[in-house]
Each structure stands twice: as C-alpha cells, then as structure tokens.
Amino acid sequence: MDFVSIEKKWQEFWHQNESFEPKDDFNLPKKYILSMLPYPSGEIHMGHVRNYTIGDALVRYYRLHHYNVLHPMGFDSFGMPAENAAIKHGIHPKTWTYENIENMQKEFEALGFSFSKNREFATSDPNYTEFEQQFFIDLWEKGLIYRKKAMLNWCPNDKTVLANEQVIEGRCWRCDTEVVQKELYQYYLKITNYAEELLKDLETLKNHWPSQVLLMQKNWIGKSSGLQFRFKIADECLKACNDIQEIEVFTTRADTIYGVTYIAIAPEHPLVEHAIKQVNQEDLKTIKAILNTTPRERTLEKKGAFLGIYAIHPLTKQKIPIWVANFALANYGSGALMGVPACDERDFEFANLYHIPIKVITQSPQNLPHTKEETLKNSGEWSDLPSSVAREKIIAYFEKENLGKRVINYRLQDWGVSRQRYWGAPIPMIHCKNCGIVPETQLPVTLPEDIVIDGEGNPLEKHASWKFTQCPKCHKDALRETDTMDTFIQSSWYFLRYTTPKNQRENQAFDKNYLKYFMPVDTYIGGIEHAILHLLYARFFTKALRDLGYIDLDEPFKQLITQGMVLKDGVKMSKSKGNVVSPKEILKKYGADAARLFILFAAPPAKELEWNDSALEGAHRFIKRLYDKANAINPTTYKPEFKEANLNEAEKLARKKVYEALKKSHEIFNNPESTYAFNTLIASCMEALNALNTQNNERILCEGYFVLLQVLEPMIPHTAWELSERLFKRANFKPITIDESALIEDSMTLALTINGKRRAELKVHINASKEEILALAKKELEKYLENASVKKEIYVPNKLVNFVIA
C-alpha cells in the first residue's frame, strides 16, 4: 500500500480547505495548544518530531470534540547560526534563514501537523521587529531598560555577550565555547523588579507545571532574607581606601557574626581599585587573574589575596582583615561577604588555605565547620541561645542601634540583552552628543543587506551609511546603536502575537479581544532545558507588557509539558555521535503515521525516548492491519444499536475493547495531572484491533471501526481520515457516546487451586451458581483430580475455588 500517496492526498486536502484555522467565534470553548517554536536550522530532527507530534495529538483530539483550537507555528529566526553559515558558505543570513524556513515548512506538512498556516511568521519579519522595537522603547521610557558598562560574559567563538542564564557550566549555551570576561556597555532589562512576583506566582503554576521546572526557577531567582550591615574601615586604613569610610555586607546567618575572622570582597568592589595600590606584586597578579576568570573557573578552586587593610567588627571592635576572594560576586548583595570559617564550608576552606584564624562560636567544638544551626557560645549576650533565636535578636539589635537592617536579596540578576552581531533585531536607540541616548522614531529599524560577514566583529560597526544617522530630537549628526537584541527577547512574546499576527502598528501588536479569548496558552510543550532561560524570560515579559498596558495577563502558560530527549544507543541523537535518525528517511520508508504512532507509543511524553527500529516497524504493521481488516467492512450494515443478549462472548469482548479504548482516550486527553500516557491509549487500541480481527460480524466490525478510527485520529490522522472517509464519509469525526452496557462485565475469572496451590483459571458467567462453578472447576482440573480423593470443596465468591484432596 502506498502510504505516502495517501498521506499527501490528505495533506493537500487540509491545506486547500484551511482545515486548521480557528474560528472567529468567541462563544466557542477554546484551546490554545503551542509547541516551542524552532530555530530554522535547515532540517527538522527527531526532537522536533516528538515535540510537535505530542502537541498535534492534543490539538486533533480537542478539534474532534468541538473546541475552537489555536495551534500556530512560527520560526525563531534571528541568531548566530545564520551568521556562521554566511561565513562558511558565502550566503546572506537572510537568504539562508528563509530557505531553511521553507524547507522546514514542507517537512512539517509531510508529518501531518495541523498548524494554523494563516498565523505563521518568523521573528525576523520586519512587522514583528517593529513591535519588538516599540516594546523596547516603551520599556526604556518606563525605566525598565537601562545601559551601563560592566564585566560581561563573552563568547570568543560567537564574538558576543551572553546573559548569565546563557552560560552553562562556564560555557556558551549555543556553541559550548569557554566563556571569558570582557568589559562592555550593555542594555539591561530590569527583570529584578519582578523577582518577587516571578517567585510568588510559581505557586499558581503548581500541579500544572513540572515540579522540577518550578524548583529550578525558584532556585534561580534565589530569594534570601538576612542582615545588611556595615564594617567601618580602620582609621589607619582610610588613606589607602581613598577615604571610603565603611564596607557593607549581607549575611543570611546573622547569628554567626561573632565568628567573623575575615571579610571577602569581589575583585570588582570599589574598595579594590584604591587599596590595590599597596599590595605586593604576587597578590596583585592574583587579583588580576581573578578578574579575568570566568564564573565557572571561580567555582573550581578558592583563590584570594589580602588587601593589607582592615575593618572594625561592629560588636567586638576587633580588626578584621579584608581579602579579595574569587567566590565573592560583585552582582550579589553588596559584593562583600563576612567570612565565618567555623560555620561555613566555603569560608572554612578559604581560611585553611590562607591560614586565617578560626573562631568557634557553637557549643560543639569538634568536626568543623558546623554548618547546621546549634546553640551559640562566645557570642556576647546571645551566648547559650539557639541559632534561630539569636539570629532574630541580633537583627533586631542592629536595626534598633541603626547598625544595619533586614533586607531581601535575590540571586536573579538583570537581563543583559545587547549582542554584538548582525543577524538580530536592531536596538532602536540613537547616540547623540547633544541629547544622549534617544529612541528612534522611524520604526522598524531594519538591517542593511549590503554587508560583509567575515567573522571579525560586528558588521554593523563597519557599515557607515547605516551607522551614521541624525538625532531624531535635535537633527544633528549621531550614531545608531550597532548592538542587536538577544534572541530570547523574540521568543519572550511570540505566543501573544499568534492571537492576531496580522495586526499593524497603528492597531497595536495585539487585538485585545482575541488576546482575552485565546490567552493564556492552555498547554505549552518544550524541553526542560528552557526552564531558566526562555520560560523565565517569557513570564517576565508577560508581566512587563501587562504593566505597559498592552495585555491584561499575569502568566502566559497555564500548563507545561517538558518532553524527554530522543536517544539512540542510550545517548542523545547528535551528528557528532553519528547516531542521528533522519525524519525524511523514516517518512519515505514508513510514512508519517507510523512515525507518529511510534513516537507516542515508545514512552510517555516526560520520559526519554529510546529509538527502536523494530518498534517503528511494529507501528507500521499495526497501520497495515488496520487497512487490511477495513477491506472486510460493509459500511451499509452499521447500526448504532445493539442487543447485548444476542451477542456471543467474542463479539461482546470486541465491543468491550473498542469502548475501553474510547474511554481511555477521554482519560488520557483530559488527565488533570497532564501526564498524557499515550502509550497506554495506543496499547488499548491495539487490543481493540486484535479483538476486531477475530470478528466476521459486519455490524460489530462497522461499529468498532466507527469508534476506533475516531480514537486514533489524533495519533495517525492520515489513516483515520482515509478509512473514515471510505467507510463513513467521516461521520465518526464527532464526539461519540460511550456505550456503558458494552463495558459491563458479565463474566468473572476465578483462581482454581488444589490444597491451596494455584493450578488454573476459570472464566464463568457472573450469575453462575455455586453448583455450576464447582462442576466447571472439576472439569478444568480433571487431570489433577482423576486419581485423587476430594475431601473438601471450597468456593470463595468472585475469587477462587479450592479442592482439598488426600
């Protein structure tokens, strides 16, 4: 059978009839199902196939049940790979990108994915960029974007800045190159303004998002409560510190303040700039080395240098040495930490390394450090108190004496969004000597196409006619911003744009009626690797756009599915490992439906999927059997009413299996726990087909296929449409009522035992008498009983029959 031709026929039908476009009827119940948009790399991979197959199954089920479904697709089309391709192949990034989009569109269609074609866009489209640039200006004017110079994560390979979230174990998230530090000007989005709301609203996502994702975001936001206080610089050190009077410190363990034996500050701390002038050459070399290390390198081993200056302990008045340490971070708290070696593993390790004294302040002097809370000693008036009690009393004392205050700190840092590359959305700002930084007024700011990409710096810096412009405010000569936006900005609001993608600027980015109807996204599908990148940014951007008045929404995604990776030979598929399976080859050999069926059957969505050629062939055989048995069906014999009493056991079993599959379908697709165990549903469908294959009763076959094809449509749509059209003119593509009578058990299975040892099973009618059951049991166990003397017959209703023999 030519499965590919059949699939192509229905794909053309769906396209011509715009079968997957949502209706403009706000009274209909809606579902917005969305899979994370792909980067147009050229060809789809099995990870794409799995992601979009899961989403498409949900979409098709809801359409069959009369939901107005929005299921769009787009392309996250800006980014470094296009520039790398330009260097490697001598092709313009725009050409490379849009050719890839066209290719991927064809592959998606060949898989039968039911995307709304009329809502498709690429994030590099000028109309999309225009709104994004307007958002940037609005955020700037609201004070949610600022520009400053800072030490930044720099990828030497991609020659661009990376946000903290884009550095994975010290390496670039995209190309895996070791990240270094570089000082540059950068635009920042003030995501920290939303830290508390982002944390608090995680509670609303419980039971709807995977707990692991919620925990990852909670830890990344990293809320901590503690004491912020000051150490005064010792009088004799003020000159070396250029009259800086004090150093501010944050601690979550105020109860350990009497154990402080040193202060650790980040190499970027303003105190270092002045005090460094008096350190010896070896320590100077160490400090400079720390400054140039990556965040990952700073975690590998503790390093530091004594600055030769002291601070005064606010309670004991003792001198405390000030050290530069690589574990002190400039962007956390004040960039200064109090070192308590007796109560902290990191502080203990550093103190031992540099022979710094250790002061024990807990009742148990053995096995330092004591990281757990204990009863204090050597802690002034707070000695003999439990740590938790002492902590509150010490904070209260500091606040009363105006020595410090209770504060909340967050690990989350503002989002740096400047990128030194060509193929990105231009930042719509003008640098004017007279007016400063001025927003562009003519949007969109588009990229020049006559550029040379050679891998040496940002091409926009070298494009004079684009770079040099006029200030929109004073009309004097000015410079255009040559940095482009981080591509994570594009993916932080695209799901909103899908609601009305054709809106022009004068009508705003979104039609609020459509936005109110379709948002939030009901089910969002993508990899867990996006937990603290895209998913956190999208939540932030939604809240920021709300505060700008564009939308009335707090959270963008109601439910989240994080699908597992596709593995082959136990490892993730990748070209470097040579274990890639080509979707094109699979489609050519087996067809789209077999690939879809295998993907859904091989593992539940959240689990890793191990590629298995024999299981794929099994899916192919199932579809073939479905076609083969359909040839025996005469659809004119189908009547929906059956009298159970007139059916034999095999016929009853066939109906039971079919309606069990229908019932299972509703359970899977409407599962409140969002596990979507499609594998169990497909197993139920296979049992139903096995039962139907034993049948010659055309009415049973007709009813069975009428129901089963509807159940299978979300998973193998081409097959379901072909056979449903052939047999029923697709009359079965509607909600079907479960015939509960078919599910009623009229038989029971009993265990048959002799002297308590299980020997067999017996299936009997549920209303069979004890005498009938014993007679049937004896017959079933005849070979065990023929030479035995039965002493006792025991019948436990609905469970077992036991014969006691001599």
From Swiss-Prot:
GO terms for molecular function: aminoacyl-tRNA deacylase activity; ATP binding; leucine-tRNA ligase activity. Its EC number is 6.1.1.4. The keyword Lipoprotein does not apply. It is an enzyme of class 6 (ligase). It is found in: Cytoplasm. One of its GO terms (biological process) is leucyl-tRNA aminoacylation. Belongs to the class-I aminoacyl-tRNA synthetase family. This is Leucine--tRNA ligase. It comes from Helicobacter acinonychis (strain Sheeba). The gene is leuS.
